[in-house]
A protein has these predicted regions:
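Polytopic transmembrane helical bundles with strong interfacial aromatic enrichment
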Residues: 1-113, 117-152
Length: 152
């Protein structure tokens, strides 16, 4: 693994960890400003550094990176304007995309998972991504309905 790839992976994992803490804050009503800042910075950095890998045409990774940056721009705007619901949904959506990439990369790089899905198009990958979508959608729904977190 190159130094750049290792850097990209580390900031991605830090962003995912911070994102989970941020979601906990949404659910518990805690603002956690340092975790929010770390999540936004690391997740933006992850998306940006993803564009510095060798270009082989438009790939799902490039599309996810673009979508993620648009969502993160919305999160930053929502934070500055104190749009609580928009901030919650955009942060959880950005975390969803980060974890989705983690799932795909795990099936590509971890030998035991790769044996289950050598092409990445096997049903097990779709099941994992579908389960992830359900979990993050439920977390967003609970966070919005609970109204524990406010940007005021």
């Amino acid at each position: 693994m190159s130094t750049f790839t290792l850097f990209h992976v580390v900031i991605s994992l830090v962003g995912i960890g911070a994102g989970l803490i941020v979601i906990f804050g949404f659910l518990s009503g805690m603002k956690l400003p340092y975790s929010n800042a770390l999540f936004l910075v690391m997740t933006i950095a992850t998306s940006v550094t993803g564009f510095f890998f060798p270009y082989h045409g438009i790939t799902p990774g490039i599309v996810v990176g673009i979508v993620s940056l648009v969502i993160l721009a919305l999160a930053v705007l929502a934070l500055s304007k104190r749009w609580t619901k928009t901030y919650i949904v955009s942060c959880i959506a950005a975390e969803f995309f980060n974890v989705m990439v983690l799932i795909v990369q795990s099936f590509q790089k971890i030998p035991a998972l790769h044996a289950l899905a050598p092409t990445g198009k096997e049903p097990i990958v779709a099941v994992c991504q579908g389960a992830e979508l359900v979990v993050f959608a439920v977390l967003a729904w609970i966070a919005i309905r609970k109204k524990a977190f406010l940007l005021r």
